[in-house]
Amino acid sequence: MRILLTNDDGIHAEGLASLERVARTLSDDVWVVAPEQDQSGYAHSLSISEPLRLRKIGEKHFAVRGTPTDCVIMGVKKILPGAPDVILSGINSGANIADDVTYSGTVAGAMEGALLGIRSIALSQGYSYVGEDRIVPYETTEALAPALLKKLVATPLPDGVLLNVNFPNCLPEEVVGTVVTMQGKLVHSLWVDERRDGRGLPYYWLRFGREPVEGKQGTDLHALRNRLVSVTPLQLDLTAHEIRDQLSKALA
């Protein structure tokens, strides 16, 4: 089984090294094609206004000056000797759940894989802060992902479906179990932080100010809050099928 790894945190991210260790429990044919720099929040963007630069880091390890989507395309269409059987994207530093999946470069890496007809799974690990230090228990994903991925890789999926897996912010022995979930709903809390440069000109940072949300039972939010691993099937078809008839009647 050939496995392609990517992420959005960059080629040198701790989570990517952790994912490679996980992948090597499944296969000896593991390839890494990841962004040269942090691409968090770039979602499913493509680099079409500037060229991509490719750098070989080591055996089967490549850095692309581009987005996670660029990396998957380069891996599948340029770098690997043949199409991978599985694409794994992650392990992201922080959960990718609810509305945040639309911003996520980690999820987008798996999304591009699904577009290419390849079994694709995004993996993310919740974290917490101790003072100003971000503590990401990657050991939780490393301990639990191998057995879970064996099951997920062996499970048939319809075309156009990818899997979004999130691990709770706790130690492996504190995880209660694994559940299949749906996307939850966060309170939109992005805000604009205006500052001034040395010449007095304004510049801006977009910042998260998350409000605590428990989430309804059955959602990814609720699962992580209750120390459960969340597995959410996502689909490429974004059509809101349930209101098509209603719209047709309104336009008749």
UniProtKB/Swiss-Prot annotation:
<dbReference type="GO" id="GO:0004309">
    <property type="term" value="F:exopolyphosphatase activity"/>
</dbReference>
<keyword id="KW-0378">Hydrolase</keyword>
<comment type="function">
    <text>Nucleotidase that shows phosphatase activity on nucleoside 5'-monophosphates.</text>
</comment>
<keyword id="KW-0963">Cytoplasm</keyword>
<dbReference type="InterPro" id="IPR036523">
    <property type="entry name" value="SurE-like_sf"/>
</dbReference>
<dbReference type="GO" id="GO:0008253">
    <property type="term" value="F:5'-nucleotidase activity"/>
</dbReference>
<dbReference type="InterPro" id="IPR030048">
    <property type="entry name" value="SurE"/>
</dbReference>
<feature type="binding site">
    <location>
        <position position="40"/>
    </location>
    <ligand>
        <name>a divalent metal cation</name>
    </ligand>
</feature>
<protein>
    <recommendedName>
        <fullName>5'-nucleotidase SurE</fullName>
        <ecNumber>3.1.3.5</ecNumber>
    </recommendedName>
</protein>
<feature type="binding site">
    <location>
        <position position="8"/>
    </location>
    <ligand>
        <name>a divalent metal cation</name>
    </ligand>
</feature>
<dbReference type="InterPro" id="IPR002828">
    <property type="entry name" value="SurE-like_Pase/nucleotidase"/>
</dbReference>
<dbReference type="Pfam" id="PF01975">
    <property type="entry name" value="SurE"/>
</dbReference>
<dbReference type="GO" id="GO:0008254">
    <property type="term" value="F:3'-nucleotidase activity"/>
</dbReference>
<dbReference type="GO" id="GO:0046872">
    <property type="term" value="F:metal ion binding"/>
</dbReference>
<feature type="binding site">
    <location>
        <position position="9"/>
    </location>
    <ligand>
        <name>a divalent metal cation</name>
    </ligand>
</feature>
<keyword id="KW-0547">Nucleotide-binding</keyword>
<comment type="similarity">
    <text>Belongs to the SurE nucleotidase family.</text>
</comment>
<dbReference type="GO" id="GO:0005737">
    <property type="term" value="C:cytoplasm"/>
</dbReference>
<dbReference type="GO" id="GO:0000166">
    <property type="term" value="F:nucleotide binding"/>
</dbReference>
<feature type="binding site">
    <location>
        <position position="92"/>
    </location>
    <ligand>
        <name>a divalent metal cation</name>
    </ligand>
</feature>
<keyword id="KW-0479">Metal-binding</keyword>
